[in-house]
């Protein structure tokens, strides 16, 4: 499953690069487009949809997709694309440094180490409460950058990115599963729903922090979340 999930995201990334080239986007816009059109909100929104439609038992598939298909690729290939789009020099050392010093990656390794020790309950509760505020705070930060007068800025790029991410790629994946595996198994349905998630908040934050185009990143988040109410419903109904 891990290699399959990674393959799906890499295919999405390759397709977004081709579409971006067809649109003749400059390097800055192309990098932003690739990040937004590839990485989905597979945890915060994805887990909520999985829990609502298929139950908590199947969140584990979403978790595997989120870690290996979203998180690890975002902090590796995604960081490379962001620095490339901004025109910075890329090297194995600089990319490795960015990955290792990326706060979520640091916490990932600390968590692995912490599993060998008995953590006091109050610390666990505190970290859980702090963790639950991550996405809301990120959304507030994004919202503060959103200007209504610019809501339709770069709309031709934003709309193509959202359609590619939430409609075209999920349909291709769905048809592939239908041909090779069938779509009756719940893990297949969960995978398709994860693929169809709107653009990832953290990806947009990293894109903005890395100096990529704010308007494309922010407007794609807004349009993606709104569109997901309809697109995810249609996918779930078809898969039912």
Model regions and ranges:
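Alpha-helical transmembrane segments of multi-pass small-molecule/ion transporters
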Residues: 1-240
